[in-house]
Regions:
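Hydrophobic and amphipathic membrane-targeting/association helices
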Residues: 1-183
Length: 183
C-alpha cells in the first residue's frame, strides 16, 4: 500500500514537471495515377530504383518506398533549411537547435564560436553539412515517425514530435510539402 502511494506520488510529480511533447501529424492517401512516368522517374532516382526492373507501376508507389523518401537525408535537409515563415529569416534548423540547447553547445566550442545556419546555402561549408547530418540522424531516431497505419491500404502518416509546438507543426507541414512536390 505504502509502495503504491509512493509510486503514484512520483508519477504525478514527474507528469507535472515534465515538458509537454507536441505532435504534429499529417495522414494522407498515396494516389497512383496513370501516365505519370516523369514523376515516377524522379522518385525512382532518389530511392535507387531502376525503372527497367519494374513491371508494375504500383510497385514504385508502394508506401514503403515513400516512407524511405520521407526519411531520406535530402528531404530532411531541405526541410531543416527552410524558413520558419515567408517574412522570417530564421531557418527551422536554427529554431530546432536553440530549443535543444545545441546553439549554446556549439558556441562553447572554439571552432564553432560564430557558427550559424543563417547564411546563404551557397556559403555553407562541410562543417554545416556534418552538423546537419548529425542533427538529422538524431531527429529521425527520436522525433520523426513515418508509418503506414494499415499495411493493406495506401495510407501514410507523418508525425513530428517536439516540445516546441510551432516547430513540430511547421516542420511537419514543410516536410510533407517538399516530398509531395518532389514526386
Amino acid at each position: 500500500m505504502l509502495g503504491s502511494l509512493v509510486i503514484a506520488i512520483l508519477r504525478i510529480t514527474y507528469e507535472v514537471f515534465r515538458d509537454p511533447i507536441y505532435t504534429a501529424e499529417t495522414t494522407f492517401i498515396i494516389e497512383v495515377g496513370e501516365g505519370d512516368m516523369s514523376q515516377l522517374g524522379s522518385l525512382a532516382s532518389v530511392v535507387g530504383i531502376n525503372l527497367n526492373n519494374i513491371s508494375d507501376e504500383s510497385q514504385l508507389f508502394d508506401t514503403d518506398h515513400i516512407v524511405e523518401l520521407y526519411k531520406s537525408y535530402r528531404m530532411l535537409k531541405l526541410a531543416f533549411l527552410s524558413r520558419l515563415s515567408d517574412d522570417d529569416s530564421e531557418r527551422l534548423i536554427t529554431r530546432f537547435a536553440r530549443g535543444k540547447k545545441l546553439l549554446k553547445r556549439w558556441h562553447r566550442d572554439d571552432e564553432l564560436k560564430n557558427f550559424s545556419f543563417e547564411i546563404p546555402e551557397a556559403d555553407m561549408s562541410v562543417k554545416h553539412d556534418s552538423i546537419l547530418m548529425e542533427v538529422i540522424d538524431d531527429f529521425k531516431k527520436e522525433q520523426l515517425i513515418i508509418a503506414k497505419p494499415n499495411r493493406k491500404l495506401m495510407i501514410l502518416s507523418v508525425k513530428v514530435e517536439d516540445d516546441d509546438a510551432l516547430f513540430a507543426e511547421k516542420f511537419n507541414t514543410v516536410l510533407v510539402k517538399i516530398v509531395n512536390q518532389f514526386y
